[in-house]
From Swiss-Prot:
Top-tier EC class: hydrolase
EC number, as in UniProt: 3.1.11.-, 3.1.13.-
UniProt xrefs under Pfam families: TatD_DNase
Main localization (coarse): cytoplasm
Protein known as: 3'-5' ssDNA/RNA exonuclease TatD
Lineage summary: Bacteria, Pseudomonadati, Pseudomonadota, Gammaproteobacteria, Enterobacterales
Gene3D superfamilies: Metal-dependent hydrolases
Species per Swiss-Prot/TrEMBL record: Shigella flexneri serotype 5b (strain 8401)
Single GO cellular component term: cytoplasm
Keywords tagged on the record: Cytoplasm, Exonuclease, Hydrolase, Magnesium, Metal-binding, Nuclease
Residues that hold a divalent metal cation according to the record: E91, H127, H152
Protein role: 3'-5' exonuclease that prefers single-stranded DNA and RNA. May play a role in the H(2)O(2)-induced DNA damage repair.
Amino acid sequence: MFDIGVNLTSSQFAKDRDDVVARAFDAGVNGLLITGTNLRESQQAQKLARQYSSCWSTAGVHPHDSSQWQAATEEAIIELAAQPEVVAIGECGLDFNRNFSTPEEQERAFVAQLRIAAELNMPVFMHCRDAHERFMTLLEPWLDKLPGAVLHCFTGTREEMQACVARGIYIGITGWVCDERRGLELRELLPLIPAEKLLIETDAPYLLPRDLTPKPSSRRNEPAHLPHILQRIAHWRGEDAAWLAATTDANVKTLFGIAF
């Protein structure tokens, strides 16, 4: 099983990053996609992906950091995307929940990254919070120019999920679905996601599954917990976990064009 969303550049992993990666593979994870959320972290993610086997990375600017976007950023992302470890542009998108960057700054950076991905024929790794309508409006003109797209850490509604799937967008599901307080709506729509459009992820070190036992004392999530998330998703979808692992792995290979 492949974790499509690991924030391995996080300072929370600074002291034991090697052990975190080793634990993931010991637990049965067979590949990691390391998320780049700004230029500096995208550069770090690429270096980590080169350092560890069966790891790849994304290169892009998260909506929270969109105020940093400038011409030099674009040039650096394009240069970074030429590295073999980098297999997607992102994390890019819109987040109108907290607006750490203004909506205008977010939209400018998002469209710029969609254009880069289209020009480089690379898939996009996307983020959307409380911005679905505007997100889809900006994305729609680019979808037929992109080889693929995933909306990572999906937490939206049934209608939003169906709108994405209808346009060929992959849906990334995290341990959010294991949260009995805020993940119930997501849990109910799990069976409606076509298996061929489903991807799984931890978003580590964030989103530690609330039903994980025993819970780590650090309360830190890590990719070794992906098997737990997979098992819970398979249970709620009424599918065999091994089959779902193989299916989501095949989806990773199709979307990102990688072998593992």
